[in-house]
Amino acid sequence: MRSSLIASSCAAAALLALSIAPISLASPTSEADAPTPSTQASSPTQTETPTPEASPSTSVPSSLDSTTASGDTPTGESIPNGEDRSATDDNVSLSPEEQIRQRWQDMGAENGVLGTATSGLVPLRDGAFIQFYRGGQIYWTAKFGAHASRGGIHSAYSAQKWENGPLGFPTSDEEAQTIGGIRGALQTYENGQIRWSSQGGAHPIWGKILERYEIAESEGRSLGWPTTNEMKDAADGGAYQHFTGGSIYFHPSTGAHRVTGGIRNLWAGQSWERGQMGYPTGEETATAGGGVYQTFQGGAAYWHPRTGTYYVHDAMLGAYGRAGYEWGRYGYPLSNETPSANGGVYQIFQGGTAYWHPGSDSYFVHDAVLGTYAYYNWERGELGYPLTDETPSANGGIFQGFQGGTTYW
């Protein structure tokens, strides 16, 4: 179970220590809507594999693997007298054994959370050492000093193959935090973090997803606590991870981006990254009139407090763009695309309706012409689908061409 460098006598002690801290399962937490409204959504089943390489909120879909390792003792409490014992000027002159013993004493010695030792010092790779206790372990490295591993974070670290896995050696002790009113703790490692919360359990974060997570935190848009490990989409090289405040999705061609709230719910209804929207290509961005939009491989999602969340793509997005997007005369979408007569589709916006047919491009119909169009039963009537945008004519009038004729105003 341990490195080949560990003597067989110490390996037995390690097994004893590990057997004492049972692993329990915790379910993912629900997420609060912020800043856009949310409805519950489910996610396709995908395979969980840690991938060290590697955009407002809903509940984590129950179909996801959200197994957590939480341990007997809640790990969201700071270690008593838990000052940093990294390799500083104050303790660098101490031997590894002395630094480990000092760390153990700071934590209450045999009466603390670690309890009594079950081994002596065991050598590890790169000149590091470990000592086992009834309630956990203490690691020592020349670069980072002595740091304890215990509780739910300890169990999650074990699942990642300890220091020989993608996280490497611990670089800090456990630190208590509260995010969004949820109590938890954080411990850092050479190549990532493990975060534990009272609702989501303990999960590692690393790579590109960790980079995006930390950027969001620095911008005051925290995603909260992780509720799953990083999940790899084996089909196309992407990965994602769910949090109490949303999700982060990564793909080599798009980078890592947050998806939250109403936009996340809409995306979930489109089969997530496997649907026509694909992976997110940008962050949620504030725009006209208090709304937001987010771009995806297949189009753009728009949310506004008075209209809700809708998706615009392909030819409709082209026509919408020609008219100035949400800043133009048509405003925000009021519906998704809807199939219509003869293989065509339409989409309703605040300022008019866009139509598309396989035999033509996408065009808007609005105002007085839209009234005439409605009188003739829209695209299902004798006028059929529009073939042009509205065009100014003499004396301030306008006209618009349709499959079945031309309207004038």
Where are these regions (language model features)?
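Secretory targeting and sorting signals
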Residues: 1-28
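Signal peptide processing junction and immediate N-terminal pro/mature segment
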Residues: 22-40
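Extracellular mucin-like PTS domains
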Residues: 37-63, 67
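Extended, compositionally biased repeat/scaffold regions that form elongated interaction surfaces
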Residues: 61-409
